[in-house]
Amino acid sequence: MRILRRRLGLALGSANTLSRAEIIALTRRAEELGYESVWAGESWGFDAFTTLTELAVHTSTIKIGTHIATIFSRTPGMLAQSAASLDDISGGRLILGLGTSGPKVVRDWHGQSWERPLRRMREVIDIVRLALSGERVDYEGELFKVSGFRLRAALSKRDVPIMIASLGHRSVGQTGEIADGWLPIFPTTALVRESLIWLAQGAVRAKRDTTAVEIAPTLLTAVSDDDAAVRDMARAHLAFYIGGMGSFYHDLVIRQGFATEADRIKSAWAKPRREGREAAAAAVTDEMLDAITLVGSRTSVLGRLSAYADAGVTLPILMFPFGADRALVEQTLEALRPDRQ
């Protein structure tokens, strides 16, 4: 059994349950404790690039990552501009995490058609990499045609790492072909092991080193002696994703062996708001929590981190459940501090 040392990331999400001042303070504390990276997401809350810009100017060494920036809400050119700006502001600390999001958010929030996500991801990354290289961009793809422009910005001498949030067999395989890292969310250790096969197959197709891809899953985490309280938070969090975020997470949980639970959660979520939320959370079983989350005592959470390390994870990214206040976040950060593992 292995414990990952000095390699932990911190995901802030986009629910904005903490104030901006609290987020800055927590990020600075994470930097002091040896956390390697901080990640900001975006769904329909604050956008990731603005949040990370604020964090970049208040920190000096911790890496900053988009978690994730959706490729359906920005053009490849805009993504390249934003990445170049943030990498410059942060002094070369950016990790560009990209994802397709899902049909519900893309169609109902951004008003865009969710079409050909795999092809779009491939072309977006092609164009962004070309733009960030400083070369003139002349690109003719199936979805994007860009001609005659060179990014007008002071560019870093390094290659900005690009990581992909992917779930399915084909998308994970493509991640192995074209990305520097894989950003799954809520995987079991069994799914990590299975997906590493798909990643390796993609890397082989692209004639890449099969170990070149960072394995950085998002893991729902809370360390507390009040086991019942944090498990209830985790139940509510998973219920929201499985029941209220379209079919993506519902299908993911089914793939991981929890079909009955997933259907019960989705059915409960469809009920009137308060009744539905409570029923959906109650349908999240202890077996699901034990397989998918890291909540409980310090000893139990460190044991779970070791299990993920054994499965092939290289950089766990810790996400806190909805309802976690600053005290719980600080307690968790201190309990898992990389400089003491």
Regions found by a protein language model. Give the residues of each.
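Active-site-adjacent structural elements that line small-molecule/cofactor binding pockets in enzymes
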Residues: M1-Q341
